[in-house]
């Protein structure tokens, strides 16, 4: 095991979302569903977590390094090698929450397993 599985409470907390388009919007929706407050990088001093959702690999890496230097834990969409944490595929049947993760190795496999659990 190379990661510590945990559920992090973010209700009321600012979470940086860097990017534009659907990928960034999906991260912002995820933060909101968990009760967090998506914010721009200019408000990073209020945050502990950040999501980077940029298509350009160099821009994503630059943003991730900048946020890490500010002390934030960073997730970079589709670039697990740049991530401090990865996101599992989630089955939410409140109050039960099941998470399936491959540590970023195969999002497709994690989704497949989650769908089997939903059945």
Label the predicted regions:
Residues 1-45, 49:
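Hydrophobic, well-ordered beta-alpha structural blocks that scaffold small-molecule cofactor pockets
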Residues 3, 7, 45-46, 74, ...:
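Glycine-rich phosphate/adenylate-binding loop
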Residues 16, 47-57, 96-104:
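Short beta-strand and adjoining strand-loop segment in the mid-core
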Residues 22, 78-82, 103-104:
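Short, ordered loop/turn segments at secondary-structure junctions
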Residues 24-26, 59-60, 106-110:
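Short glycine/serine/threonine-rich phosphate/pyrophosphate-binding segments
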Residues 49-54, 60-87:
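ADP-ribose/adenylate-binding Rossmann-like module
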Residues 92-119:
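Adenosine-phosphate binding glycine-rich loop
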């Amino acid at each position: 095991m190379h990661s510590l599985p945990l559920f992090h409470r973010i209700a009321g907390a600012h979470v940086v979302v860097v990017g534009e388009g659907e990928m960034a919007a999906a991260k912002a929706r995820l933060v909101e569903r968990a009760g967090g407050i998506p914010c721009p990088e200019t408000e990073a001093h209020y945050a502990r977590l950040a999501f980077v959702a940029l298509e350009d690999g160099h821009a994503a890496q630059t943003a991730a390094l900048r946020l890490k230097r500010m002390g934030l834990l960073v997730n970079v969409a589709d670039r697990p090698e740049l991530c401090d944490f990865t996101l599992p595929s989630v089955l939410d049947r409140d109050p039960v929450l099941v998470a399936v993760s491959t540590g970023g190795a195969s999002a497709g496999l994690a989704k497949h397993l989650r769908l089997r659990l939903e059945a």
